[in-house]
């Protein structure tokens, strides 16, 4: 009888060195709205349009996107530690700087999760068609190259593509079988807030990033301009939603997303004060922005579903 005893022993020996809570901490679950929400909003939007959807493929895409996000998170942490972007005195990821994990553990975790996500993506390609292959390849390459792009002021563009435009277009194709460019109407506002998560992080870390001799977009702009850019990223999505309702490309119930505006305004005001009061006041702004992303996107999603069922 075939057993998986040796494999199970290997997994236990590797995983058993750390608690489940430590592994969970390593993958930064608070950031998952950045990957999950674009898929959820896209599914809700397509439901509102009356598209003939494969919901099983939609859920599969959601899980796969989060797995790619996990791989990207720990892959970035590994490279940030190797390049001394993250140190004991920095406020970034602490899984390596505190000695909780060894570099090879984080590297292997990134590779392992990436392989699982890639296998899931290839399976979806076989079930849906070649267009998904090119979308998936672009996303995979951008995920792997993210550290390099981030160090050369292109991280924000990478995130906008990887966590907004590509997943929304890909989700539309996977669930309906066609490329639906109208999903870009929802990709932009959701993607801008996602970019705000990264931008708040990079604005906070400008001093240690300069010491590590990397160049982020926030560093190029400077503290004041970075604060203005962040404010645009979290506030403009609300303007966009209103304009889309006026243009009748979104149903009027999506205006309920404006309920999240006070959260966005609070985040913006905090960032705008940071050039005067210092980076300490934005230590948790990336997490606050992720919460904004979740609230804004869930409200949009609920509105699309209600619009289809009720109005």
Write out the residue ranges for each language-model feature:
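Functional transmembrane core segments of multi-pass inner-membrane proteins
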Residues: 159-212, 224-228
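Intramembrane alpha-helical segments
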Residues: 16, 94-182
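Extended hydrophobic alpha-helices typical of membrane-associated regions
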Residues: 246-307
């Amino acid at each position: 009888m075939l057993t998986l005893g040796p494999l199970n022993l290997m997994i236990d020996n590797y995983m058993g060195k750390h608690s489940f809570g430590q592994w969970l901490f390593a993958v930064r679950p608070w950031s998952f709205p950045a990957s999950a929400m674009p898929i959820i909003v896209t599914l809700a939007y397509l439901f509102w349009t009356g598209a003939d959807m494969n919901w099983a493929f939609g859920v599969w895409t959601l899980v796969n996107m989060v797995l790619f996000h996990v791989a990207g998170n720990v892959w970035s942490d590994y490279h940030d530690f190797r390049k001394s972007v993250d140190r004991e005195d920095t406020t970034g990821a602490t899984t390596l700087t505190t000695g909780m994990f060894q570099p090879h553990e984080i590297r292997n975790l990134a590779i392992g999760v990436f392989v699982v996500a890639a296998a899931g993506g290839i399976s979806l390609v076989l079930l849906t068609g070649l267009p998904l292959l090119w979308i998936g390849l672009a996303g995979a390459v951008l995920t792997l190259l993210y550290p390099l792009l981030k160090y050369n002021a292109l991280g924000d563009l990478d995130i906008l593509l990887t966590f907004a435009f590509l997943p929304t277009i890909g989700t539309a194709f996977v669930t309906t079988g066609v490329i639906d460019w109208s999903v870009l109407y929802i990709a932009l506002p959701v993607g801008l807030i996602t970019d705000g998560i990264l931008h708040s992080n990079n604005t906070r870390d400008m001093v240690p990033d300069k010491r590590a001799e990397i160049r982020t977009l926030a560093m190029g702009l400077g503290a004041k301009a970075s604060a203005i850019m962040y404010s645009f990223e979290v506030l403009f999505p609300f303007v966009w939603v209103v304009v889309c309702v006026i243009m009748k490309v979104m149903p009027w119930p999506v205006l309920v997303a404006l309920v999240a505006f006070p959260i966005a305004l609070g985040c913006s005001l905090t960032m705008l004060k940071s050039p005067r009061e210092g980076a300490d006041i934005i230590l948790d702004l990336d997490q606050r922005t992720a919460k904004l992303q979740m609230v804004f996107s869930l409200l949009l999603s609920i509105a699309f579903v209600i619009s289809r069922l009720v109005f």
